[in-house]
Amino acid sequence: MSNTTVEQFAAELKRPVEDLLKQLKEAGVSKNSGSDSLTLDDKQLLNAYLTKKNGSNGGTISIRRTKTEVSTVDGVKVETRKRGRTVNIPSAEELAAQVKAAQTQAAPVQPEQTAEDAVKARAEAAARAEARAKAEAEAAKLKAAKAGNKAKPAAQKPTEAKAETAPVAAETKPAEPKEKAVKPKHERNGKGKDAKKPAKPAAPAVPQPVVSAEEQAQRDEEARRAAALRAHQEALLKEKQERQARREAMKQQAEQQAKAAQEAKTGRQRPAKPAEKPQAAAPAVENKPVNPAKAKKEDRRNRDDEGQGRNAKGKGAKGGRDRNNARNGGDERVRGGKKGKKLKLEPNQHAFQAPTEPVVHEVLVPETITVADLAHKMAVKGVEVVKALMKMGMMVTINQSIDQDTALIVVEELGHIGKPAAADDPEAFLGEGAEAVEAEALPRPPVVTVMGHVDHGKTSLLDYIRRAKVVQGEAGGITQHIGAYHVKTPRGVITFLDTPGHEAFTAMRARGAKATDIVILVVAADDGVMPQTIEAIAHAKAAGVPIVVAVNKIDKDTANPERIRQELTQHEVIPDDWGGTVQFIDVSAKKGTNIDALLEAVLLEAEVLELTAPVDAPAKGIIVEARLDKGRGAVATLLVQNGTLKKGDMLLAGTAFGKIRAMVDENGKSITEAGPSIPVEILGLSDVPNAGEDAMVLADEKKAREIALFRQGKYRDVRLAKQQAAKLENMFNNMGETQAQSLSVIIKADVQGSYEALAGSLKKLSADEVKVNVLHSGVGGITESDVNLAIASGAFIIGFNVRADASSRKLAENENVEIRYYNIIYDAIDDVKAAMSGMLSPEKKEQVTGTVEIRQVISVSKVGNIAGCMVTDGVVKRDSHIRLIRNNVVIHTGELASLKRYKDDVKEVRMGFECGLMLKGYNEIMEGDQLECFDIVEVARTL
């Protein structure tokens, strides 16, 4: 390190390069740039030059910059002036010391002080310490005057400690810059410990004042103003603490009064919210003796903060307070960190909260609800609901769903009122939609349902009206599906519904959808009133719709219309020409006789009913029929009841929804809209809806999807509940119970009397263990719907004088559904009785096979006791059950472990022969005991 550059040497001396180059030129060393190298001789020349120029006493230049700040505290202007700072410029001796240190590399390059410089520094430090001690003494006096005599010892001891500390601080290092922030607690404590040691000066010197009298006066004035400001702040703080203490007392008194009033009102005590404790009220109210050590520590902290803490706010010092903080009563929390951000409270904020009554919410709880939604309804945090559920033994998360009963219990536990919410009823939604859309009601065509007994000519009558041959397309000539048609007549439009039976009609009536306005009751003139006809009359009367009787097949020679009128009169269907209200029309579907008169009678009934429906409104209707087409997907026949159905509408039908992609009428023609009472085929639903489902047009897909998914969940829950008993895990539980087995039967007969008699006879066969469950009974052939019902329920089908069509037989063969045909009712009863007998649990009986006498007992180690026996009666078999009888008392019942004769294992031993045997798990046998051998035989039971 003998050769260094000018730039490096300037950095070591902490001098600008230009100044150093100038001084080198003045010393006779020619250097032009900072990159030129300096030798040891060059440095010595520079040192000699500076020593000659400045002398040994030069080197300290005081640069002071005063800054005055004016602050306003509660209307009082306080002027504070910041002290200047001293910048030390190294002298020639210090430069020489730095050069020497660079050569030896024994210590970092630091300007060394000579003895004379050290004396000067100590004198300056002593003067500053004395001035600071004076300021502290004045501040302590002012503080003592305000707070009383309790702070006098605490103010005197820190002053003495500070006076002792000053020489040591001056001896160890020069005055520190003002930028340093407040030191940590442990550093202050360490400084205090060092202050207790007596400081010995290095050399005796007379301290000389380094500041002028004017500057000293300014410093004294500044210290006095700071002490006055601090005393004023402390007085304000004390006053605020007293006010806060009074508020605390008032709050506690108000809480006690509110608590007493609540107890008197409710009769039970609720735990009140604990009030927050005041943090700064205790020192202002209580006059406790001050600990001298604590007072000394606090005063030392205040002294350290006096010069530096005043600017701590602007410099991010931790723990510093400014005047605004003191004005707010000290309620400003300082968050640790680099920037020292502060979380400010409002100036008038306090811990007092007025007692309020607990808010009780009325919570509507749906069938399922998540924990988060339940907490939101009660206006509590989700953690509280999770805690309540955990106390009930349920480990749940905030996103987990709980059932309605559990949610109601949680609501009650948390002090609120829980009520089960009404289900998302589609009917209610329809009502809201109807109220929202008010459209003018216009006349609509009547909807007519054709009912009657099988083969009485319902479909043939509709064929003639429609001028089509629909019957030829049906398998076996029997109507299997519901058909919907509308016919235009000179007097208006009529919509017809053709049904194979009464089931679909009954389902419509049960749901309250008024799909039918008028019923045409078709009765064959040559057959008379049949049970199905009577049932149709009952359904029409239950629905409250008028009846028009069409007496068909009057073209036959055996036709007797008058007999039909007489028979119907017995069922309260009285012709209008006999003084009743029912129109009777004699027609012939084959020849078309009086068809126009029948349509005229239907339109006359429609005029009396004054049928109207809104047209300019969202459509709603009922699903008449639905199927899954291979090429087109879900196809549904919809009967529009209100409004106008348009292509592109969003339709909801049961659990199915979708945008209508195509609309086709009954003739196969594509249409774009359909008004009230018009049946159409629609395409575009997401799934096949059930027949009889209500359909409605919604505004958007979101609402339709929401309701459809809700219904799917409801139907799924119902389905799972029904299947619960048949699950594998519950099967053994059901076996343990004495539940009766069920034999499910579907009965289809030619006439109502036949299936009623057959159903009644089968139900009489029911016993305690086996019951007959007639799932469905009806008149007509076996259809695909019957086979599907049998597949779903595990039933078999009885056909009494009827047969299944080709499609039904094929479906039954593929799904292994048993179909039995009978012509005699007793054969059907006997077969069902035999099937029920097979379902009965067999009866177990004991059959004694032989008797054995024990004549000798042989004990064999590690084997047990072996009985030497004689078969006295019957046969003893190896797998026989035995009873050990001693003195005519049964001692043990069990099985044989082994059966031998002459050391050979045998399967049986007959009477009169000897044998040896062992009992399984039993050795307590004696000579003279009797063994009774028996077998358990299962005997089939009969009804």
Curated annotation (Swiss-Prot):
One of its GO terms (molecular function) is GTP binding. Residues 552-555 are annotated as: G4. The lineage of its organism: Bacteria, Pseudomonadati, Pseudomonadota, Betaproteobacteria, Neisseriales. PANTHER family: TR-TYPE G DOMAIN-CONTAINING PROTEIN, TRANSLATION INITIATION FACTOR IF-2-RELATED. Belongs to the TRAFAC class translation factor GTPase superfamily. Classic translation factor GTPase family. IF-2 subfamily. Signal peptide: none annotated. Transmembrane segments: none annotated. Disulfide bonds: none annotated. Residues 443-612 form the tr-type G domain. One of the essential components for the initiation of protein synthesis. Protects formylmethionyl-tRNA from spontaneous hydrolysis and promotes its binding to the 30S ribosomal subunits. Also involved in the hydrolysis of GTP during the formation of the 70S ribosomal complex. Residues 99-113, 145-172, 200-215, 251-264 have a biased composition (Low complexity). Pfam families: EF-G_D2 (PF22042), GTP_EFTU (PF00009), IF-2 (PF11987), IF2_N (PF04760). GTP binds at residues 452-459, 498-502, 552-555. Residues 498-501 are annotated as: G3. Residues 117-141, 173-197, 216-250, 295-308, 319-335 have a biased composition (Basic and acidic residues). This is Translation initiation factor IF-2. Gene3D superfamilies: P-loop containing nucleotide triphosphate hydrolases, Putative DNA-binding domain, N-terminal subdomain of bacterial translation initiation factor IF2, Translation factors, Translation initiation factor IF- 2, domain 3. It is found in: Cytoplasm. Residues 477-481 are annotated as: G2. NCBIfam families: IF-2 (TIGR00487), small_GTP (TIGR00231). Residues 588-590 are annotated as: G5.
